[in-house]
Amino acid sequence: MNRLFTILCMVSLLVLHTSCNDSVMDLESPNVEMKTRAVEQRVQNLIQQARQGDVEAYYSLALCYRDGDGVEKSWLNMICMYATYSQKTGGDIEDVVELFDEGHPFRLLFEIMDSPSFNEEVEAKLERLKQSAPAEAKAIDAAKRAFTMDEATVAMNIFREAEDEGSELAVIFQAIYYDEAKDKTGQEECLTRIAEKYPFFNLLLGESYVMKYGECEDFSYIQKAIDCYYKADAYGMLIPKYANALWGMYDYFGQKGMLEYDEQEVERLKVLAKRTY
């Protein structure tokens, strides 16, 4: 389970109250719309700051994803932003749990996934999770019974059901399944699909294209990889490892005349590639 949580790390919506009174709603709606636009604009500003390497912007975006503030609530996207913040500041990714109060479903999920085995204490936490986040508990229940690839294949149906019911952990389990099964076609389809909601999965998809380039040296795969990295970058999710990879592509293929070398962009990527260790 520790290995699974390591992979996972590498890796309430904004409620607007409106009155039933038509006249009050007419007065409040413009303010609500203005507030919504302001919040969305703030998120876009934070993303642009993150794309320039502003460390605090990563932390602020993590909170936005935690709270659903201007974006759809997502603990997976939250972890991506917090992980980058941690890499930039020398912090510990596991401190992300401190963003939640005791008893919060994410804390339960964290504690379950961080446990080396399913002992009685963990089973009790899983029962509590079933009450507060049943879709996540459903995914864990299926995963803990999948010891072989055949069992994992059966569990995939449950993972898809759990994902439809709102489980984000089920998304991770599906990505891991295709990786362990060495199913490159299934992996590409899976990553392409889930990257629409969780942009950082574009980084893994891009990495898979780089590996394909290594097998056949078809430059179109490098172009696909670059496209994927920039899709993640558009959300401020180009983490140091992949910023460094993209910088390397500009350097290597630029010298060969296969990519246009953009010095200003390379300098930006160098900033993003920096970490404290």
Per-segment meaning from a language model:
Residues 51, 69-73, 116-117, 148-150, ...:
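Short coil/turn and helix-start
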Residues 60-67, 81, 98-103, 111-112, ...:
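Hydrophobic face of amphipathic alpha-helices that form TPR/SEL1-like repeat modules
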Residues 21-23:
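Bacterial signal peptide processing site
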Residues 16-19:
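C-terminal motif of bacterial Sec signal peptides marking the signal peptidase cleavage site
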Residues 51-54, 67-69, 88-92, 96, ...:
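Short helix-capping/linker turns of helical repeat alpha-solenoids
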